[in-house]
Amino acid sequence: MVGFSLGEIKPRQRCLVQVLSKIDFTGKKLLHLSDDGPLIEALYEKFGEVEQSIYEGKNSLDLTEIDRSDNTYDVILCVHILEHIENDSKAIDELYRVLTVKGKLFIMVPQPAVFQNTMDWGYPDPNQHEHYRIYGKDIVDKLVRNNVNVEAHLVTDEITFKKELVYEITKESL
């Protein structure tokens, strides 16, 4: 971890790296949908091509209408993004559309195992970091489609011992 301090790294980022580090991404095309800091960026060298989209920043993509062709990305990282999108179902459909067959989409949301059911209030709540919703365990139902496999990884951060869920979605053939 040369070049940055552990204080710059969040538990969710370390947990995601634990999952990603077990997979060979050589030559794969990555879409990274946030600025997750140096730990994730250190993984970029594992990929053949990397595109990063930062909301209202560098290469900002509208996830409900992604301006890319079908089957463009082999890997998509969507970390703490969906709760900020009004129409998250449309965003999920778009992510699946631009994901290649056999591609992998990794999704993380804040505390999905705390509540049984998602609480969606239909507006960005300023008391909840502008989130439209707090996902519950039922997020898996929202992610499931006929042509995808959803696997939940419960990962423990090795420093804080905080537990995080990383959803790994693999797009199967149509």
Give residue ranges: language-model regions.
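Hydrophobic beta-strand segment of the Class I
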Residues: 73-77
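Conserved N-terminal segment of class I S-adenosyl-L-methionine
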Residues: 1-71, 158-174
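S-adenosyl-L-methionine-dependent methyltransferase catalytic module, highlighting the catalytic core
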Residues: 86-100, 104-174
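An acidic- and aromatic-residue-enriched active-site/binding cleft used to recognize and process polar
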Residues: 55, 78, 110-112
